[in-house]
Amino acid sequence: MNTRQDPLLLWLKQASEDQIRETGSTRGYLLQIGYGNKKASPEISARLEAATGGEVTRKQLRPGDWSVIWPELAAA
């Protein structure tokens, strides 16, 4: 199973419904990701990074394969 995503859980505590909508997901599903019960898809990971202004990153959400999915980040 995935690991707990504390930055995501902290963000979810203060996120508005509009901010949640920007992720293309629901608060309930994001909580499942936050508690490590679900893995964030590449699309949700990228949307979360944008919606949180970088508080939650794709690298945090997908530590095992982010460099394969987003090779441009590996060079940065």
Give residue ranges: language-model regions.
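A short, Lys/Arg-rich alpha-helix, primarily the initiator
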Residues: M1-E22, A50, V56-V68, E72, ...
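Short, solvent-exposed alpha-helical "recognition" segments
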Residues: N37-E43, I69-W70
